Amino acid sequence: MIEDFSSPNGWDVLWEEHEAYQSCASIKDSMRDTYAMGLIHTFSDEFKELYEEYQGNYNDEYNTKLSEIFNRHDNETIDKVQESLIELKDYIYGFEVDTGKSDIVTQKVGINLCWSGDAVYSMDTAEENEVLLYFAIPSYCCNIWFDAFSILSEVKDERLDAAYSFLDFISSPLIASENMDYVGYTPFIAGDDVFSLVEDWYEARDVDENDEYIETEGTIPYDLSYFFRTNEDDETEYVLYVEEDQINRQMRAQYPMEEDLPHLAIMQDFGETQNNKIVSMWEKVKVNPLPIWVVIIVVGGFVGLLSFFGSYKLIKKAKIRKRKKLREK
């Protein structure tokens, strides 16, 4: 399964009549994230052509072209994505916002389109019950998501100072590492405190009597230098040796491999007009029109119930009148 979703064809698998995956995937009830998924599938041929054109040389130029396709939101694109997402509903379990991270642990669903921190939560929780879950990044394109704090433009004086102080506080490496330890989400902050926490979590080598790492079978190098180096002149090697399955588990969810980065794109703002159109499109996708035969049965059943209860009340009234007449005699 993990190979299917990590492949260039990773997103498209969900749109196929696949016995193992049919009706077992939950998708985010999140307009932007699911629009991104639908767009990647809709233009999968273009993404694949680009992927093959730059095979082995995924650079900034490649990412720029990738992002151009990924950020289409013209009217024609919106209509095509809507068709793709409506079609997707025939193959999935349903939409969710927050239950997916638990549903996949309890095996109510088998696949979940998830945010990285939720993926870590699910994998950690399942592992407590001796169940292994895996995290996949489809290789030709994936959405970069992030949360952010914002300061209102009209805030002034001491409130503005307080806001900046709070941002400084949560952005310090020590506090960032404590937050990551609590919620499982990766901060944009580097620093030794954060790296030490990641090292505590994932470094799998044994140590000798001098507390020095020694070569350990079943571990592979995982280079995080791209993230933790402080500047271009920093030559520090931030390499962990992790268990082999971490390539598709918590490590990959929290810190993608450097080779993943060119295939990741950031969705830009749609603009007010197109954003409203995509909101409208998303509402149409989520509406679940019932087949006419279901409507007939439901309405017929409802009318039947009304008729039954109506008849029941008439019969009851007739019996009451009859008893009254008997008492009068």
Can you annotate each of these PLM segments?
Residues 90-157:
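Extracytoplasmic/periplasmic substrate-binding proteins
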Residues 42, 126-127, 183:
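Active-site catalytic pocket residues across diverse enzymes, especially alpha/beta-hydrolases
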Residues 12-15, 36-39, 82-86, 101, ...:
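Non-transmembrane alpha-helical segments in soluble domains
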